[in-house]
């Protein structure tokens, strides 16, 4: 199931993932992604999402897509850059839900931001279309190769960014 937010009501978007979805299931999923109050305060489940979800923020769109996926209840989930171009709060909500989901389901996370995959059972470091390294975060860090170098660089950049805005 490839999540796309359609120009329909929120309820109808959930029904595309699970035809017989209940309001309780929808509200539970919305609470998990911290959208419950926003949806209830802005038209409820009958709120129409405009073309390309232009009437909600990028973070809200990503969290709504995740909520729809949670209701779909599949065995395998693939998240491809699930936290790209969103605010830090939305990123934390999404990653916490993905981590929780991975306790019961098979989850594949594709991410350029390595901080999002540190807790993964296995990380595949791909460069130029080829798997160059694989292992846990600690194993890859101990190799002192591509993954470790990129992770360290990203961490330094993020720490520098935090210092600049603090």
Residue ranges and their predicted role:
Residues 100-109, 117:
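Conserved catalytic loops of ABC-family nucleotide-binding domains
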Residues 36-64, 157-166:
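ABC-fold ATPase nucleotide-binding domain signature/coupling loops
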Residues 73:
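Conserved catalytic motifs of ABC-family nucleotide-binding domains
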Residues 77-81:
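Catalytic Walker B motif of ABC-type/P-loop ATPase nucleotide-binding domains
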Residues 66, 110:
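Hydrophobic anchor residue at the start of the ABC signature
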Residues 24, 41, 96, 118-166:
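C-terminal portion of ABC ATPase nucleotide-binding domains
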